[in-house]
UniProtKB/Swiss-Prot annotation:
Pfam families, A to Z: DUF2117
Domain of life: Archaea
Protein name, entry field: Uncharacterized protein MJ0065
Naturally occurring in which organism (per UniProt): Methanocaldococcus jannaschii (strain ATCC 43067 / DSM 2661 / JAL-1 / JCM 10045 / NBRC 100440)
Length: 363
């Protein structure tokens, strides 16, 4: 029997449950595991699971399920922030995957409200056997989904989307970009003509809205709070790169792994506090330094983020980081190979030529 497993998010990996469940499933046959999502890739690296969990592609969980659809049975593992967020996640993913095959979701193992949900239940003997076995071994109840899933509606030319399981003060991310902060447990995003225009129960972050540009709230990936709550020991790669190309990232930092693939990169220039936090943390695992351009509006979206030694963060004093990013894009030769110090000197020269005031932090 062939079992396809999709693992979503860092929490299920950092908790040790991803590996435990994969080993339990081996009793029933051959297990093939794929990751869904981005921050989970860093957790896989930190936990030395690259040979067990495939992280070679950047896939959404529904895409990972589709890629594994030729297996006899599918498992979806997740460790949501709460029961409602976990069930909502499962319902959205299963509907987007649109597969006519049983999917067993394992949600929040180790928590009192942890559950197992059987999606597309065909009442087959083997599905029941696996679900009951996991229920017993993990001490989880088999339950029906308690969520309505994706709650999106339209009114007077505007699109509304309810966000589940939000805590006051949490950052709200849409497609990897921080767009606002929650002021209430009840949060509804509002878009008009493809632009995010308001957050009921929250406040907008203008810089994030500009970076987001067009958004389809029916398809958008929405997260709240900290992207990785319990990081294990980071596996920092230390390597000296003599020279290489420069990449500038000014949007969703989660995409950085794709952008550095086979590029021979000496450093990544990250524009924005949140982008710098995410990119710095990811790139430390690949031995790549960053040059961060920030203006001090960082949200807590990672616990204890790591930045590679030798990296430099600039805190801009008289301009928005986005504007500085545009100046760098215009003036830096991205087709030229630099050594790190040469690149740093060139960035400072551009700052001075454009009267950009900054404070410099060397890691």
């Amino acid at each position: 029997m062939r079992i396809g497993v999709v693992i979503h998010g860092p929490e299920i990996i950092d908790s040790g449950y991803a590996l435990k469940i994969i080993n339990l499933l081996k009793k029933f046959g051959e297990v093939k595991a794929k990751l869904g999502g981005t921050m989970g890739r860093v957790a896989v690296i930190d936990n030395n699971l690259q040979d067990i969990i495939d992280i070679s592609e950047k896939l959404m969980p529904s895409q990972s399920l589709k890629k594994l659809a030729n297996n006899d049975i599918l498992i979806l593992m997740n460790y949501g922030k709460s029961k409602i967020t976990g069930h909502t996640f499962g319902k959205i993913v299963v509907e987007r995957a649109n597969l006519n095959k049983p999917i067993i979701q394992i949600e929040r193992p180790g928590e009192e409200d942890g559950t197992i949900i059987i999606w597309n239940d065909d009442n087959s003997k083997i599905v029941k056997e696996i679900a009951n076995y996991l229920s017993k071994e993990l001490n989880l109840k088999i339950e029906k989904c308690i969520s309505n899933g994706l709650e999106v509606w339209e009114k007077e030319g505007r699109v509304f989307r309810k966000v589940h399981g939000v805590d006051v003060g949490e950052a709200i991310l849409v497609n990897g970009i921080v767009v606002g902060k929650a002021k209430s447990n009840e949060v509804i995003l509002i878009a008009e003509n493809g632009k995010l225009v308001d957050i009921i129960g929250g406040e907008l972050k203008e810089g994030g809205i500009e970076k987001l540009k067009n958004v389809d709230l029916k398809k958008a990936v929405i997260k709240t709070g900290i992207l990785r709550r319990h990081p294990t020991n980071p596996k920092i790669e230390s390597k000296e790169i003599d020279e290489g190309y420069t990449i500038i990232i000014n949007h969703a930092g989660e995409d950085v792994i794709e952008m550095i693939k086979n590029k021979g990169v000496v450093a990544v220039i990250t524009i924005g506090d949140d982008t710098t936090t995410i990119c710095g943390d990811i790139l430390a695992r690949f031995g790549i330094k960053i040059i961060g351009i920030t203006d001090g509006d960082r949200d807590e979206i990672l616990k204890n983020p790591v930045i590679l030694k030798g990296s430099v963060i600039f805190l801009i004093k008289n301009m928005r980081d986005d504007d500085v990013g545009r100046i760098l894009e215009k003036n830096l030769n991205l087709n030229k190979k630099y050594c790190y110090q040469e690149l740093l000197d060139e960035v400072k020269k551009i700052f001075n030529d454009n009267n950009i005031c900054y404070e410099e932090f060397v890691y």
